[in-house]
Amino acid sequence: QDGASQTLVYANADLTKANQADEVLVFAEHWRSLTGAYPARLVMDQKVTTQAVLGELDRRGITFVTLRMRSVSLLEHIAEIPAGAWRTVALDRDGAYRRPKVVDEETTLSSYPGTVRQLIVSGLGREAPTVIITNDRVSSAKQIIERYARRMGIEQRLAESIRSFHLDALASSVPLNVDLDVVLSVLAGAVCASLRRRLVGYNNATPDTLQRRFLSTAGRIVNEGDGVLVRLKRRTYSPVLRHADIPEVAVPWWGGRTLRFEFD
């Protein structure tokens, strides 16, 4: 999922636990085939990658940010950190956990070539410190912590897709049906993301809210010859649609005929 637009840009219905660690490399190649370059930065959960894969990302020049599993030896290392080594970082967010304490250091991993930057962060509302590892040695500790924290927003959007499109309950064990479900879910998510950006006051609306208030509106479809008119019936939230930026669109696969909306 794209961190800025929160649009789901990649999905794989055939992913299993056995091959999930390499999927980040598959995505990197997919992104390069579309854009001509590897993604500049990948923020990921530690469960979907390995140290060897992180090394390969570094070799390809891709910046990564992920968590490190808290092993017994790592917890012992954290316990031995002197009090004077911790420094306070002020995060740009509201709430009780906006001033965590951080230890910024270099460390080695058993299956990672060279060293990696490690941020040990205490005071984020968890019992044990959060340990972030990255090959980004340019950004400040504050920037890296905030960047990783935005992953929670992405997970929230995925939870919305699960709730709205039942993304975790695909239709069938038949691969064709599953792939179709995933493609339709990606398209539906993109359509909802585009719609909410056009509706005043609904920039953060969830797909199920859009469905209830706008998409389930009844109406009539009129074939005008050189275009199609969709006339929607009046509802409580019709004024929001009237003021929305929904332009008349020429549809290529309709031979250039237009699609436009009107409201009773």
Where are these regions (language model features)?
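Electropositive, glycine- and tryptophan-enriched low-complexity nucleic-acid-binding patches
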Residues: 1-35
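An acidic- and aromatic-residue-enriched active-site/binding cleft used to recognize and process polar
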Residues: 3, 13-16, 45-47, 53, ...
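Short, conserved catalytic/metal-binding motifs centered on acidic residues
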Residues: 6, 24, 39-49, 64-65, ...
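Flexible loop/turn segments at secondary-structure boundaries
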Residues: 7, 17-19, 48-52, 72-76, ...
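Short, surface-exposed connector motifs at secondary-structure boundaries
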Residues: 33-41, 59-60
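An anionic, glycine-rich sequence signature occurring as long contiguous blocks
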Residues: 55, 60-157, 161-166, 249-264
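Short, solvent-exposed helix-loop connector elements
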Residues: 141-148, 164-180, 195-207, 226-234
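A short, flexible helix-boundary coil/loop motif
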Residues: 191-264
